Design a protein with these regions (language model features):
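Short, hinge-like loop/turn segments at secondary-structure boundaries
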Residues: 21-22, 46-52, 122-124
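Short, flexible turn/loop "capping" segments at secondary-structure junctions
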Residues: 1-2, 52-56, 105
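Short, flexible, basic/aromatic active-site loop/helix in glycosyltransferases
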Residues: 42-67
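A generic structural signal for alpha->beta connector loops
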Residues: 26, 46, 100-102
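Conserved beta-loop-beta/alpha segment of the NTase-like Rossmann-fold superfamily
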Residues: 1-43, 62
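Conserved alpha/beta core of the MobA/IspD/sugar-nucleotide pyrophosphorylase nucleotidyltransferase superfamily
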Residues: 59-136
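A generic structural signal for secondary-structure junctions
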Residues: 25, 41-45, 77-80, 129
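Residues at the C-termini of beta-strands that transition into short coil/loop
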Residues: 33-34, 53, 109
């Protein structure tokens, strides 16, 4: 198995990693994720809401994203051979598109945030300073 993790997520915990290891053994592909708490709107090019998806079906994807080694390697081989790589935003999408993989959502933690904006970095610093079970 291979774990793909985003270095901008320093608050990943042992519990998240262990849950992903458990799920990849059963499902061959899994991603750390949490249920969406906010209402999400689909908008048009003018910023006008055109649809409100059912929140109960939406998950916020994190890392690690974990795959059987051969599965993700074959998926990436197919990606590199394809002329149309548009719309790929994460490793799970590569596996879904090129291997038709059913990716398991592994329940993660809301503290496993991606620190990409100044606000994210402040929140991450708070989580890391709390002396919680955050792994580095």
């Amino acid at each position: 198995n291979i774990f793909i993790h985003d270095g901008a997520r320093p608050c990943v915990t042992d519990n998240i990693i262990n849950a992903c290891m458990r799920d990849v053994m059963q499902y061959k592909a899994c991603v750390a994720a949490v249920p969406v708490k906010d209402t999400i709107k689909v908008v048009d090019t003018d910023g006008i809401a055109v649809n409100t998806p059912d929140r109960s079906t939406l998950w916020q994807i994190q890392t690690p994203q974990v795959f059987e080694y051969g599965l993700i390697m074959e998926a990436y081989d197919r990606l590199y051979a394809d002329n149309d790589k548009s719309g790929i935003t994460d490793d799970a999408m590569v596996s879904e598109r090129y291997m038709h993989t059913k990716v398991k959502m592994t329940l993660s933690e809301y503290t496993n945030i991606k620190a990409t904006t100044p606000e994210d970095i402040l929140v991450t610093q708070i989580f890391l300073s709390q002396n919680t079970k955050v792994s580095m």
